[in-house]
Design a protein with these regions (language model features):
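A conserved regulatory-domain signal marking ACT and ACT-like small-molecule sensing domains
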Residues: 255-382
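Nucleotide/pyrophosphate-binding catalytic subdomain
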Residues: 1-231, 235-236
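Conserved glycine-bearing catalytic or ligand-binding loops at nucleotide- and phosphate-handling centers
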Residues: 228-234, 238, 243-258
């Protein structure tokens, strides 16, 4: 199997952990795997280097100088792991962004301009130079794997077509790992981090959450859009269909095939429409956000009548329910009798019915990072 291992900063934050990673890599190599390894800076190294640059320059460092200093964190990890692997008689070859002659990953900003220093770690649009990167990976990295060696590659950084250093922004090391897998046609990218995989709940908030062994890219992007962070969703945009992403706890890295969560599928936009016309029921009231159980009671009453809600919207002054058009009038009469009868304390004062509503569903991972996208979509519909 051709595999990419991506080690997060916690996973290699000490010399002992680097040694353990090297031993695991050497063992995988003996089993016949072709391996490339992507490494983050150790622990809090990036922030320490940023603070040093800010202090030394009174926050007036030019961007390339800052990148060179910060990149030393990833390069240190790269050379430490390379040394550890060589001590185990592994043919390890380092690839660091400061050495342009061997570096394979080429990424530009859309306008070709350098970004502001204070935004070194922000989310940014990227233009991955697919053809050039694939050519360089084929010429520089693949030969190492084919002869039985290990390519050790710095994460988070890239070079532009004009040769400048740049970063991949938030989630950059995850992006690096997936891109390396993409350009090496790897069967799996294994992200080795400080959690055991993707869980059914946050273990800090819920007892005994269970490990989810498999999930789709779409599901993971949905989780990430609502605050969950295991694999950065930006990284998943570059995942090929043929490549599996696996999230594994560094404490269980010796059992890669038996642990963690596998992420399957690809990240792609979708457009669909509900085939059946909908009705929109709008219930108006006061201080609805401060009242407990309003939406639950409405849904319960409709459910007992065999009427399904397909979507809902609420705020402090109204509850808007969407349901099949054929159920609209029955639901209207039911909810009107509810708000004027036994449930007047819910604070609802008026209900309106609008039939003939169409439902169009658009989904894209780009929506989260695209300001004004809702206005653009609704302007087309208007």
């Amino acid at each position: 199997m051709r595999r990419v291992l991506k080690y997060g900063g916690t996973s290699i934050e000490s010399a002992d952990r680097i040694r353990r990673a090297a031993q695991n890599i050497a063992q995988l190599l003996k089993s016949g795997d072709q391996l490339a390894v992507v490494v983050s800076a150790q622990g809090n190294d990036t922030n320490l280097r940023l603070n040093s640059v800010y202090t030394a320059t009174e926050r007036h460092a030019d961007l390339q100088s800052m990148y060179r200093v910060v990149a030393l964190g990833e390069e240190k990890s790269t050379f430490l792991l390379t040394a550890a692997l060589r001590s185990l008689s592994v043919d390890a070859v380092p690839f660091v962004p400061s050495v342009a002659e061997t570096w394979p990953l080429i990424v530009d900003s859309p306008d070709g301009a350098l970004l502001q220093a204070q935004k070194i770690n922000e989310e940014r649009p990227l233009e991955v130079q697919e053809d050039e990167s694939r050519r360089l990976f084929g010429a520089r990295v693949l030969p190492v794997l084919r002869r039985g060696g290990v390519a050790v590659i710095s994460g988070f950084f890239a070079r532009s077509m004009r040769g400048d250093l740049t970063t991949l922004g938030r989630g950059g090391s995850d992006i690096s790992g997936v891109l390396v897998g993409r350009f090496l046609d790897a069967e799996e990218v294994t992200i080795i981090t400080d959690v055991e995989g993707i869980l059914s709940a946050d273990p800090r908030l819920a007892e005994n959450p269970r490990l989810i062994e498999e999930m789709t890219v779409e599901d993971l992007e949905t989780m990430a859009s609502r605050g969950a962070r295991v694999v950065h969703p930006r990284a998943l945009r570059y995942k090929p269909e043929s490549c599996r992403v696996r999230v594994v706890d560094f404490r269980r890295q010796e059992a890669l095939a038996q642990s963690g969560t596998s992420v399957l599928g690809v990240s792609e936009p979708s457009l669909s429409a509900r085939s059946e016309p909908q009705s929109m029921l709008t219930l108006v009231g006061k201080d609805l956000a401060g009242r407990t159980g309003v939406l639950g009671e409405l849904a319960s009453q409709l459910g007992r009548a065999g009427i399904a809600i397909t979507a809902s919207t609420t705020n402090d002054t109204f509850v808007c329910l969407y349901l099949a058009e054929r159920d609209g009038e029955a639901a209207y009469r039911l909810l009107h009798s509810l708000m004027t009868g036994s449930q007047r304390e819910m604070g609802l004062v008026n209900v309106t019915l609008r039939p003939g509503v169409a439902e169009v569903r658009l989904r894209s991972p780009e929506f989260l990072q695209t300001p004004g996208i809702l206005a653009e979509i609704t302007s087309v519909l208007a």
